[in-house]
C-alpha cells in the first residue's frame, strides 16, 4: 500500500529524482533520505506548527526598510539662452523685447558710461523705468537696478547680463583713459559664456544695494554660485587708476553677501576678492562660493568693501577708490 510522505517545508533543502524508481530528499540537518517511487503516493509539504502565543525568532535579524529619500530638486541660474524659461517681456524705456538672456546684453562697443540705452537710458530721469531681468520658470530669482543718484542707471549700481572679456594686456595698452570701454568685462579669452556683471555704488554704506529676490517672496536655500572680479578692479589693483593706487599689503577688496530670511533676520557670507599685493589671493578666475550658511532666504544683497577710501566733502560722504565690479554665474537654488 502506498503512503503519503509528509514533509515540513522548513526542513527540506531539495527533492531529487535519482532514477525512474527512486528519489532522494535532502534536509537542512544534512541527512539524506531515499524512497522508492512505488512506495509513495504523494509528497505533502506542511508548515511547522506555531504557538500563537510564542513570537517567532528569525534566524537573522530583520532590518526595517529605510524610507528612500527623494533627491533634492535644484535649479541653476546660468544666464545661458538655452536655459531661459522666463516669459517674454519688454523694456519699454528702450524698446527692447526680451525673449532670451542675450537680448539684454549691451554691445561690446557700448560698455562705457552712457554707451548703451539698455543700462543708461534714464540718467537723471527720476521717473524712468529700470533695467530688470527675471529667471521665472527656473530659480524664480529676479533683479532690478536700484534707484540711486536720481536714476535707475548702471552708474548707480546694478547687475547687468554680459558676455564680454578682455585681456590684461589690452587694458594696459589703453591705460586708465580707455579702460572704461571694458566696463562690463572680466579677464580672459572671449567665450560664449554668459554671466551677470555687477557694479556696486562707490559710496560707503550706500543704501542702493544690489539685490536678487525670489519673485514669489517664498524663502529658499541657495546652495552655491561662482564669482570672479571684474577686469577693471584687477587692473587698478596692479597699476592704480585715476582714482586709486596700486594695492599695498594692507589693502583689500571684499565681497559681502547678506541673506534675508522671512522673519527679517540676516546671515552673511564674505569672499575676499583681493588681499594685499599678493596675486595668489586675487579671485581672477571663476571661484565657487558656498552659500548654504545663509539658510533659507527671500532675497540676497551684495556689496563690496574696500580698504582704499576717500572723501570729497570734508568727511560727510566717503567713497571707495578702486572700481568695484564683480561677476556671478551658476547660482544653484534648492527648490
What is each model feature region?
Residues 48-71:
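Ser/Thr/Gly/Pro-rich low-complexity, disordered linker/stalk segments of secreted
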Residues 77-81, 249-335:
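Terminal, low-complexity interaction segments
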Residues 1-24, 61-68:
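Bacterial Sec-dependent N-terminal signal peptides
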Amino acid at each position: 500500500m502506498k503512503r503519503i510522505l509528509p514533509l515540513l517545508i522548513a526542513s527540506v533543502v531539495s527533492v531529487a529524482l535519482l532514477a525512474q524508481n527512486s528519489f532522494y530528499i535532502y534536509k537542512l540537518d544534512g541527512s539524506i533520505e531515499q524512497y522508492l517511487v512505488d512506495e509513495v503516493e504523494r509528497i505533502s509539504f506542511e508548515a511547522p506548527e506555531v504557538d500563537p502565543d510564542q513570537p517567532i525568532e528569525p534566524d537573522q535579524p530583520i532590518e526595517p526598510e529605510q524610507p528612500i529619500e527623494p533627491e533634492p530638486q535644484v535649479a541653476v541660474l546660468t544666464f545661458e539662452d538655452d536655459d531661459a524659461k522666463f516669459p517674454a517681456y519688454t523694456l519699454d524705456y528702450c524698446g527692447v523685447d526680451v525673449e532670451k538672456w542675450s537680448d539684454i546684453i549691451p554691445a561690446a562697443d557700448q560698455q562705457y558710461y552712457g554707451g548703451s540705452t539698455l543700462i543708461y537710458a534714464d540718467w537723471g530721469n527720476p521717473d524712468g523705468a529700470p533695467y530688470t531681468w527675471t529667471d521665472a520658470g527656473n530659480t524664480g530669482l529676479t533683479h532690478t537696478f536700484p534707484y540711486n543718484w536720481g536714476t535707475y542707471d548702471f552708474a548707480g549700481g546694478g547687475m547687468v547680463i554680459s558676455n564680454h572679456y578682455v585681456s590684461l594686456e589690452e587694458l594696459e595698452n589703453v591705460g586708465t583713459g580707455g579702460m572704461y570701454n571694458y566696463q562690463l568685462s572680466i579677464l580672459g579669452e572671449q567665450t560664449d559664456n554668459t554671466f551677470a556683471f555687477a557694479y556696486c555704488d562707490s559710496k560707503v554704506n550706500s543704501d542702493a544695494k544690489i539685490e536678487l529676490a525670489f519673485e514669489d517672496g517664498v524663502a529658499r536655500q541657495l546652495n552655491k554660485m561662482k564669482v570672479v572680479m571684474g577686469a577693471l578692479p584687477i587692473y587698478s589693483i596692479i597699476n592704480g587708476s585715476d582714482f586709486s593706487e596700486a594695492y599695498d599689503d594692507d589693502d583689500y577688496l571684499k565681497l559681502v553677501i547678506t541673506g534675508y530670511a522671512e522673519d527679517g533676520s540676516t546671515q552673511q557670507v564674505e569672499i575676499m576678492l583681493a588681499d594685499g599685493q599678493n596675486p595668489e589671493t586675487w579671485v581672477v578666475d571663476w571661484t565657487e562660493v558656498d552659500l548654504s550658511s545663509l539658510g533659507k532666504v527671500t532675497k540676497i544683497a551684495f556689496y563690496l568693501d574696500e580698504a582704499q577710501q576717500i572723501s570729497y566733502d570734508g568727511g560727510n560722504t566717503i567713497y571707495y577708490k578702486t572700481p568695484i565690479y564683480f561677476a556671478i554665474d551658476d547660482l544653484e537654488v534648492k527648490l
